[in-house]
A protein has these predicted regions:
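Conserved short loop/turn motifs at secondary-structure junctions
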Residues: 122-131, 214-216, 355-359, 363
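Hydrophobic/aromatic beta-strand patches that form the interior of the parallel beta-sheet core
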Residues: 75, 94, 124, 153-155, ...
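Residues immediately flanking
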Residues: 78-79, 214, 296, 364
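Extended, hydrophobic alpha-helical segments in both membrane/secreted and soluble proteins
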Residues: 102-106, 213, 236-238, 457-458
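Surface-exposed, flexible loop/turn segments at secondary-structure boundaries
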Residues: 82, 131, 160, 217, ...
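N-terminal glycine-rich phosphate-binding loop and ensuing alpha1 helix
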Residues: 2-152, 161, 172-182, 186-189, ...
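Conserved core of the sugar-phosphate nucleotidyltransferase
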Residues: 120, 137-209, 213-296, 300-304
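Left-handed beta-helix
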Residues: 1-73, 227-458
Length: 458
């Protein structure tokens, strides 16, 4: 039955024009799934990673930093749709400040680094079929961003969702697009090789790549980290932040007892009865930002040596074929995480960076924060925090979770929260202009739906 499932999946991918390299990788993971791989990493098989370099202690000369940055390319993951916020396109296209989107601010950051260091610093997006057109349209408004004849993007691969009952490719006539999914952001390495972009970058003299999620405005180009990475001689290094009690979800690095390799463990790879170890900020003191640095030359050599398969751990993701309909057919998506490649490279390391390099926007709570006066956006597209610490935002998900609902309830902009420790909104409230929140601000559900008047203090 499952042999038929694999063959059917391979035919479906070939008919859709998926790269042969991507089909080979999919086959590897399909066979792992068949063999019963769960991707789980029990606590007893690892040692916590507690000692890593800190950017605060790094000493790199201006010239070393500039030289390393001149050989660096920036790759931003831009293939996911902001479905959790009700979006049907890339989150990076949401406006942040003065009509500028995440993508516009990213371009500002890249152009500022080019001016400061006199380097070419290409910016390349990893898009999906569903994010490509809109994103390239935004970049078309910045013709100066393209350099060295390199493309502005490359496409991540796609693979069939598998029926959970028999592992055959799912069929969904209501929307055949929903029969497909991306193979997780671990696909970046396969897609770089299969697209020819990896060879093109090496041919033009680029040696290092820095990657991050396109919604993380904190992950600006850093000549200092580039200089550290080049000097370290390591093939691969993620940026890590020190955990706080709020950081219970982010993946962490650990040392595998069997071979001493550094590995990444995410929540989906942790046995349920061991989640208390995973969330212990003292046992596993750093979390993974998904800002990564890797050596393009070593990546190519490793991929060629392994027949294009890095062998990242499988993430078995159980979903429904229509993510918006929990009663639709159960499916399994075969995924890998970009950060899991840390275990594929001997000599991989990591670096602790300040919290300012991790500003992801996963929810409308995060979006309110980056749009608020907690941050100022400078001419270089960098977000600078105004108060000593960020305000904690909690908006009632019944009324603010989806972007359309969120925008409708802040027609005159978000409130001032720079003098607030927290902002909690219960119920359905529409905010007027110039609302100011201070201290531990709270709006109760009683009296809603309603409007909070212009100039109110809460």
């Amino acid at each position: 039955m499952s042999e038929n499932g694999l063959t059917s999946s391979q035919h479906k991918m070939r008919d859709a024009g998926v790269a042969e390299q991507a089909i080979t990788v999919f086959t590897h993971y399909y066979q792992s799934l068949e063999a019963g791989a769960t991707g789980l990493i029990p606590e007893e098989t690892i040692e916590p990673l507690t000692q890593i370099d800190s950017l605060a202690d790094v000493e790199v000369s201006e010239e070393q930093a500039r030289e390393a940055l001149s050989k660096t390319v920036l790759i931003r993951l831009n293939g996911g749709l902001g479905t959790s916020m009700g979006l049907d396109r890339a989150k990076s296209l949401l406006p942040v400040r003065d009509g500028k989107t995440f993508l516009d601010l990213l371009v500002d950051q890249v152009l500022a680094a080019r001016r400061r260091y006199g380097v070419s610093l290409p910016l390349i997006l990893m898009n999906s079929f569903r994010t490509r057109e809109d994103s390239l349209e935004v970049l078309a408004g910045h013709p100066e961003i393209q350099v060295d004849g390199l493309p502005l993007d490359f496409l991540q691969n796609r693979e069939p969702k598998l029926r959970a009952d028999d592992l055959t490719p799912v069929e969904w006539e209501a929307d055949p697009e929903l029969e497909w999914c991306p193979p997780g952001h671990g696909d970046i390495y396969t897609a770089l090789l299969a697209s020819g972009l990896l060879d093109a970058l090496l041919d033009k003299g680029y040696r290092y790549a820095m990657t991050a999620n396109s919604d993380n405005l904190g992950a600006a180009p850093s000549a200092r980290i580039a200089g550290w990475f080049a000097a370290s001689g390591a093939p691969y290094a993620p940026e890590m932040c020190r955990r706080t009690p709020a950081d219970v979800k982010g993946g962490h690095l650990a040392v595998r007892k069997s071979d001493g390799r550094i590995i990444l463990r995410d929540t989906a790879q942790t046995p349920e009865d061991q989640m208390h170890y995973f969330t212990d900020q003292f046992r596993h003191p750093f979390f993974h930002t998904n800002n990564l640095w890797f050596d393009l030359k070593v990546l190519r050599e490793t991929l060629v040596e392994r027949g294009g398969i890095l062998g990242l751990p499988l993430i078995r993701n159980s979903k429904t074929v229509d993510p918006a309909d929990s009663s639709s057919m159960p499916v399994i998506q075969l995924e890998t995480a970009m950060g899991a490649a840390v275990e594929a490279f001997e000599g991989a390391t990591a670096i602790e960076v300040p919290r300012s390099r991790f500003l992801p926007v996963k929810t409308t709570n995060d979006l309110l924060l980056v749009r608020s006066d907690v941050y100022e956006v400078d001419d270089d597209g960098l977000l600078q925090m105004v108060p000593d610490r960020a305000c904690t935002v909690s908006l009632d998900p019944r009324f603010y979770k989806k972007i359309q609902d969120f925008e409708a309830r802040f027609p005159d902009g978000v409130p001032s929260i720079k003098d607030a420790q927290s902002l909690t909104v219960e119920g359905d409230w529409t905010f007027g202009a110039d609302v100011v929140a201070t201290g531990e601000a709270r709006v109760e559900a009683e009296g809603s739906p309603g409007r909070i008047a212009d100039g109110s203090r809460i």
